[in-house]
């Protein structure tokens, strides 16, 4: 696999950005890992959590090895603490991840398919929320999505310490998280919108650990999808909000989605 640290100017964010990219590679003398790259390939957009950045998946997991197994590209952006949202301050993080970033990458690197069935978005914690937000907002661009320990019921986040920064992201007048219910920031609302419009749901994998503080969020969202008749994969198993589990279950996500 080729590993590239990419820097370019984002019009959506109005600033320079850094993105880590892994690309399939052809090689005949590589030891310990397959290098059977093809001319076209699927792309995984892999999203970080609240405290992290574009580097974290490379530093904490073996994502390069997993990507090699499935012959996929992996694109890892950095979005700060934006909740993958077009903020009220003007930074368009949802637009960046769902529109601008794929377009830029396809321009820079040949072989990345534009077909929805060849584009996956996945993430952990805040990134799990972001992955489903991207996929449910743009199912015409992302045919598969995965959340690990995702904050999937944002209206139920009861941390008052987040409100000051959330007012700069979601709504300047926000008084509590439950005001986000029924808006474009609510994953259940987005799922219901797809159902009402008869739009095909992205192939979806959700995992959360039994000891994760976001477990009830995942139960709530899974129950909502079930009520809509959505066919999806929901796994609950041993684990908490930590990398030993995310490294394990990103493999399960890839196996379910494209294996």
Language-model segment annotations:
Residues 1-259:
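Non-catalytic cap/lid and distal C-terminal segments of serine-dependent acyl enzymes
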């Amino acid at each position: 696999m080729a590993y590239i640290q990419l820097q370019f100017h984002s019009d959506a964010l109005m600033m320079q950005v850094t993105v880590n990219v892994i690309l399939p590679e052809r090689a005949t003398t590589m030891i310990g890992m397959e290098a059977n790259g093809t001319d076209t390939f699927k792309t995984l957009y892999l999203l970080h959590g609240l405290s992290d950045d574009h580097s974290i998946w490379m530093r904490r997991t073996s994502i390069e090895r997993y990507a090699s197994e499935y012959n996929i590209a992996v694109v890892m952006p950095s979005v700060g603490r934006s909740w993958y949202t077009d903020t009220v301050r003007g930074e368009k993080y949802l637009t960046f991840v769902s529109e601008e970033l794929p377009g830029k990458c396809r321009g820079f690197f040949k072989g990345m398919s534009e077909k929805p069935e060849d584009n996956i978005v996945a993430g952990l914690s805040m990134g799990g929320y972001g992955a489903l937000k991207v996929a449910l907002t743009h199912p015409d661009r992302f045919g598969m999505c995965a959340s690990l320990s995702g904050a999937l019921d944002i209206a139920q986040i009861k941390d008052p310490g987040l409100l000051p920064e959330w007012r700069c992201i979601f709504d300047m007048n926000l008084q509590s998280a439950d005001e986000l219910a029924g808006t474009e920031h609510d994953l259940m609302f987005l799922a219901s919108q797809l159902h009402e419009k008869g739009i095909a749901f992205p192939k979806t994998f959700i995992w959360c650990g039994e000891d994760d503080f976001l477990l009830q969020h995942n139960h709530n969202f899974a129950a909502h999808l079930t009520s809509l008749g959505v066919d999806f994969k929901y796994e609950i198993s041993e684990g908490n909000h930590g990398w030993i589990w995310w490294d394990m279950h990103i493999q399960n996500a890839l196996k379910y989605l494209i294996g």
